[in-house]
Amino acid sequence: NTISISGYHIREAGSTAVQEIAFTLSNGKAYCIAAQKKGLDINQFGQRLSFFFNAHNNFFEEVAKFRAARRMWAKITSELGATDVRAQMLRFHTQTGGSTLTAQQPKNNISRVTLQALAAVLGGTQSLHTNGYDEALSLPTEEAAKVALRTQQIIGYESGVTDTVDPLAGSYFIETL
């Protein structure tokens, strides 16, 4: 990717889900405008942009955040002149929220990370990093790293959520968030 636009650190610093998306997409729009001022075609460079988001604790809010961000980015790029669908796509990576992990009962973080990861997948993330359950204490141990990997594998291969492109499409609750 030519440019990766990050909102992860914004959320880790205490922003809301809405602020994370607002600032990150605004940064992306600023990159697009700057590139266009230099004569670059958004249909060419737009498909090389990627984003990096945080998955936090409020499950449904996170799913809705990612879904809304995808629609908003398509609208932003379209308004900037993108006609190629690939240039309008929000390609993004998600990492589970490090600031949500607790040191007092680290194994409870397994559930937190699992729900955050599932929210990201249901929201349409293209790649995912799951934090180790003990990262509130130190660098993840080998066991914690393995649990984080297995969490992704269970979601991807055993839960069935990846069997359809958009399993929550049409959900009144998600759409109204």
Residue spans for each PLM region:
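Hydrophobic alpha-helical bundle architecture
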Residues: 79, 110-114, 137
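Catalytic alpha/beta active-site cores
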Residues: 1-56, 61, 80-83, 88-93, ...
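Active-site or pore-adjacent capping/gating segments
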Residues: 126-177
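Outer-membrane beta-barrel translocator/pore domains, especially the C-terminal barrels
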Residues: 76-78, 102
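Peripheral terminal and linker regions in Fe-S/redox and tRNA-modifying enzymes
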Residues: 16-24, 36, 65-69, 78, ...
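Glycine-rich and small/hydrophobic secondary-structure elements
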Residues: 26-33, 106-125, 147-156
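Short glycine/threonine-rich loop-to-helix capping motif typified by GTGT followed
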Residues: 14-22, 56-68, 96-110, 138-147, ...
